[in-house]
A protein has these predicted regions:
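N-terminal lobe/hinge region of extracytoplasmic solute-binding protein
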Residues: 2-51, 168-169
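Gly/Pro-rich hinge or "lid" segments in bacterial periplasmic/extracellular proteins
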Residues: 37, 112-113, 118, 123, ...
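Alpha-helical secondary-structure segments
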Residues: 72-79, 122-128, 171-172, 200-202, ...
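Extracytoplasmic/peripheral linker and loop segments enriched in polar/acidic and small residues
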Residues: 118, 289, 371-383, 388, ...
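Append "and occasionally in soluble cytosolic enzymes with long acidic Gly/Pro-rich linkers
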Residues: 188, 270-363, 367, 374, ...
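Long beta-strand-rich cores associated with HINT superfamily self-processing modules
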Residues: 421, 477-503
Length: 503
């Protein structure tokens, strides 16, 4: 299959994008693993939950690392506490703030020894939470929570960037090689605890950025899977692919939203009215109907409908009239005219789809405001680095929720990237009321009240507009008819554990 981009890391604690998540699920395993039944025990043999739902006891299966060493509760304790070390650069560390003292440890206010995760024996892990959580078991199935081999990590901090011989993992497949700029090759792990169900002998994940090249390779039989969740199919090819008899094209809604992000500390986007104007001036229907063509849904807010049914209606595309009025008001307040308006550059990851979409938005902004907008594309890792370093004005990026809970997407914007927790908020935007509402929702036992709190938080986000949601995503992919048993969820969990070829 094509992975489109190299994973940012093969260390599951450092995942930050979908290619990294896909690769981590191939190479590692966790206490639970996502299946069609939800979070299902994997390395955990038995799970006990306290009456107050704040303490979980995980009894572990007898399982082995790929180097033959036993996987123990101590590996889990070490891995989770290392993520919460203030000096460890885990972008998703905020997900572990649900652990007792997790947030305080990441801020350096308490030592990691005070975090609520303890190995009471090699096969017993006890976890204490800050508050009850309906999604905690689902979180243990997310690659961030997969353990790493403590001895390997302590002896060789570069183990995740080494060749296959030095790489130690726990999942259905072993790493054979990682050829930078080319591919990752894995083979069946004979020491995996459930190796008897793994039927594929080898998987090659290629790094092909050009969508047409990927499609041609699929059509020529060089790929068995093309497109989502790691890559995309050229939009102009979709109508013909959909009309084929016995089509191998599949489309399903996923818990993701593609947004244009604004750097709120850089002119002109320090102005809330400018951010609103630019967001309202985008005709999302044109983007979906003429460019994307994969049944995406115009985004009225951040949270996708497949995460929350009958979600609140927060229209952010209020039309050109309001966009122009806000633009004029902001220019008057800032003292800008046509000549002095700050130059604007829109950046995006290198793909034909993103380029065409950026060109369409560029034209819409020019027609609405009479300004010129420059476009700049980057290969994936460079693009992510530009966003993380806040070296941009407007940048397009999609996010897929880690969990089946609206809180997961909203929490991205709770703190800025320079906070110890990281979290992916590279807009410089921070709002105390927004953060307070999310914190209250986390601890709220009443589902109705919790929904109201999250809706109120999302309303603030959409009024302040550090992001302009464009569309709710779909997974659009090609799969050979003989490929069976692959699991792809609305969270873009792509799992080849049970995959096989039916010749």
């Amino acid at each position: 299959m094509n992975s489109h981009s190299e994973p940012t890391s093969l260390d599951p604690r450092l995942i930050s994008d979908i290619p990294s998540v896909t690769t981590a699920k191939i190479l590692f395993d966790g206490l639970c693993r996502m299946t069609e039944q939800g979070a299902t025990p994997s390395l955990a043999l038995k799970i006990e939950v306290s009456e107050d739902k704040k303490c979980y006891s995980f009894h572990l299966k007898k399982s082995l690392w790929s180097n033959g060493e036993p996987i123990t509760a101590h590996d889990f304790e070490y891995s989770w506490k290392s993520i919460l070390d203030p000096n460890f650069p885990a972008q998703y560390a905020h997900q572990l703030f649900i652990l007792k003292n997790g947030a305080l440890a990441k801020m350096g206010a308490v030592p990691t020894s005070g975090v609520g995760v303890r190995a009471l024996a090699d096969d017993l892990l006890v976890v204490e939470l800050e508050h009850p959580s309906n999604y905690f078991l689902e979180l243990t199935a997310f690659p961030l929570c997969y353990p790493v081999n403590r001895q390997t990590d302590e002896n060789n901090p570069e183990w995740a960037n080494c060749d296959g011989k030095s790489f130690v993992c726990s999942g259905p497949f072993n790493l054979i090689q990682w050829r930078k700029g080319a591919d990752v090759v894995v083979q069946k792990n004979p020491l995996y605890w459930e190796s008897e169900v793994v039927q594929l002998d080898q998987i090659t994940l290629s790094f092909i950025e050009d969508e047409h090249t990927e499609l041609n390779m699929y059509e020529n039989g060089e790929l068995d899977w093309a497109g989502s969740p790691n890559s995309s199919i050229p939009p102009e090819a979709l109508p013909e692919l959909q009309q084929r008899a016995n089509t191998e094209l599949f489309v399903l809604p996923i818990a993701g939203t593609y947004c244009y992000k604004f750097n709120t500390k850089v002119a002109p986007f320090h102005s809330q009215k400018i951010r609103q104007a630019f967001a309202y001036a985008i005709d999302r229907k044109i983007l979906i109907d003429n460019i994307l063509q994969a049944h995406q849904i115009a985004a009225q807010a951040l949270i996708p409908p497949c995460v929350v049914a009958n979600h609140q209606d927060l229209p952010n595309a209020k039309g050109l009239a309001e966009a122009k009025a806000l633009f004029e008001q902001a220019c008057t307040e800032e003292g800008w005219n046509q000549e002095s308006f700050p130059p604007v550059t829109l950046i995006f990851s290198r793909s034909e789809k993103h380029h065409k979409m950026a060109q369409a938005v560029q034209q819409q902004w020019n027609e609405a405001f009479g300004i010129k907008v420059a476009l700049q594309s980057y290969e994936w890792n460079t693009f992510v680095q530009k966003l993380n370093q806040r070296d941009y004005q407007v940048g397009g990026r999609g996010w897929v929720s880690d969990l089946s809970d609206p809180l997961a997407l909203l929490e991205i914007y709770k703190q800025t990237n320079d906070a110890p927790s990281g979290g992916g908020n590279d807009t410089h935007w921070h709002n105390k009321s927004f953060a307070r509402l999310l914190e209250e929702a986390k601890r709220c036992p009443d589902p109705t009240r919790r929904t109201l709190l999250l809706n109120e938080a999302e309303t603030i986000l959409m009024e302040q507009m550090p992001i302009a949601p464009l569309y709710h995503s779909t997974a659009c992919y090609l799969k050979k008819s003989y490929v069976k048993g692959v699991y792809l969820s609305k969270l873009c969990d792509l799992d080849f554990k049970y995959a096989y070829f039916d010749d």
